[in-house]
């Protein structure tokens, strides 16, 4: 056994929780995702699902998925840069941009990789990234990869956000990154006030709509639409694994 294996050989905390019957992870579901699911041979209520609109078991979605698989197969067999861009990708990106109310969209394999990829692509050394201290872990990873100066403010505290903006060089790029709906707290970002501060300090705004898309706004256009600030938000991220009953993510702007 090597050093890596030795490191974890005595780690038995999960087993301790399992023995007490309180280990909450990797519970196996034996049915489709619905308000009730089958688990360990029993029907139980589902309180943890992100399928906010129930589309994961909608027959129209299932039929469209089957039709697409029969036409295109189960994979793209290449990256988007080379041979992995399908006509339905281009069509989807156009429709996403139109739906949210922006010019362009770009799809990713997951919502997590949107934040990991886009944030370091748009800010870097010499720039500032200002985040709510309750932002999602994918935003945390994205900002770490960016090599920009990282500033954090107390959750939804607009006075604290303004103080962080005042620390930034006036002529530097300043990107405020915030969850539209905070996944742990369940509250909304104060986007109207964030937009006001953006304009005052010549900053830009990136909103993670993972939990807002499909739920808030006109026809589910998200928290930005809910507050009427879509035009003032520079980049909007969304994920397909929640309301949209699939897998993947996108950024629109």
Report each predicted region and the residues it spans.
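N-terminal "arm"/small-domain region of PLP-dependent enzymes with the aminotransferase-like
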Residues: 5-74, 203
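Short, small-residue-enriched loops and turns at beta-alpha junctions
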Residues: 54-55, 82-85, 137, 158-159, ...
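Conserved N-terminal alpha-helix of the aminotransferase class I/II PLP-enzyme fold
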Residues: 63, 67-111
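Short, structured coil segments at secondary-structure junctions
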Residues: 101, 125, 145-147, 201, ...
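Conserved PLP-anchoring active-site segment centered on the Schiff-base-forming lysine
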Residues: 118-137
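Active-site phosphate-binding strand-loop segment of PLP-dependent enzymes
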Residues: 151, 155-207
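Active-site PLP attachment segment
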Residues: 225-253
